[in-house]
Structures are given as C-alpha cells and as structure tokens.
C-alpha cells in the first residue's frame, strides 16, 4: 500500500508540474523555393540571415525530412494537416481546391490547448467563401494572400485579413506600386507577437 501511495503522490506531483509550466511560443516559418544552403547558418557566405540563424540556434531544426509535394499549395496542405499527399485534400497547384470542412490543422490542435494562433503570408489552402479559409481551420488571425496566384505580385491592390480585403494604397496589382506587401505582412506578424506576448502563441 505504501508503494502505491508513493507512486500516486509522485504522479500527482509530476502532472501538476507539467500543467504549471507555460507552453512554449511557436514561430513556424515556411518559405517557398528556398534552397537548403541559402541561409547563412547553413554555410551561405553571400546572404546574411542573422534572425533566422538565431531561431535555428535556439529553437528546433528539422533536417531529416522530405517535402510532401513538389509544389506550393499541396505542400502547404501537407504541412498544415500532417497528411501524406495521397490523403490530402489539396493535390494540385490550381489554386481552387480548399481544405475540407472540419479538417484538423496544426493551428486547430494548438487552439485546443490554449494557444493564440496567427498566420501571415501566403495561405494557398482555400480562397474566400470556401471551406479552406484559415479562420475555419484554427487561426484567430490571418493576414496576407489566400490564393498563391494572387501572391505572384509584391504590389497587389489588396491583402486579406480573415476573409476581408484590406486595400494597399497606391497599388494596382503589378510589379510596382507604393505599398510593398511583404512589409505589411511582416508588421502584422510582429504586432501579433507583441500583443500576445503574455499568452502562448
């Protein structure tokens, strides 16, 4: 009986210690068409990426993995859902196939354990009025491009925040304009992190 009682006390102390710890913040970076050695921590002598290098030094690097698909939208679906390409809802890069309704994503799983979730940049898993928009798959906030074809312009006339168009002043959707979209996306991401600094994100 003493042995079982001691084991029970240990278990209670162990589990209370787990729940007392704060969940770590997660910054998940995905980049299209980035070669393995283009980052300076991988040995590139010409391109300097000190902030990403710091993430690599202090965080987790996945170095033994294969891409689930060779093109944008299917790969994004694989990474968001954790599914093999043969089971994923998005298998082509046509920009029209969305995530299925109620599809589990990394964001929806993190929401279940108390995380604030934000996505910034290119989504590629479903356009507005589809089952695949980010806010239907666990994201509190998404700001950027829903459609990867829309992302082919650095100066689009608008970006999207939770299915609502946000106008970018001085842009007509061409190769030049007044508002560089990536600066706006970066600002939105940094603002999200600053506002959520006291909660796990």
Positions of PLM-derived features:
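Bacterial Sec-dependent N-terminal signal peptides
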Residues: 1-22
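Formylglycine-dependent sulfatase
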Residues: 16-201
């Amino acid at each position: 009986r003493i042995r079982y009682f001691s084991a029970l006390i240990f278990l209670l102390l162990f589990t209370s210690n787990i729940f007392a710890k704060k969940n770590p913040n997660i910054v998940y970076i995905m980049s299209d068409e980035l070669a393995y050695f283009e980052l300076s921590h991988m040995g590139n002598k010409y391109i300097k990426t000190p902030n990403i290098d710091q993430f690599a030094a202090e965080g987790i690097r996945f170095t033994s993995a294969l891409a689930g698909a060779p093109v944008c939208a299917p790969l994004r679906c694989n990474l968001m859902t954790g599914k093999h390409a043969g089971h994923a809802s998005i298998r082509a890069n046509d920009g029209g196939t969305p995530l299925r309704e109620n599809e589990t994503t990394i964001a929806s799983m993190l929401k279940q354990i108390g995380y604030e979730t934000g996505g910034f940049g290119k989504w590629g898993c479903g356009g507005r009025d589809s089952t695949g928009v980010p806010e239907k798959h666990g994201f509190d906030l998404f700001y950027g491009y829903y459609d990867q074809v829309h992302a082919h312009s650095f100066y689009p006339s608008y970006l999207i925040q939770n299915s609502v168009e946000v106008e970018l002043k001085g842009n007509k959707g061409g190769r030049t304009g007044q508002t560089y979209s990536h600066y706006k996306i970066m600002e939105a991401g940094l603002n999200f992190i600053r506002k959520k600094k006291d909660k796990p994100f």
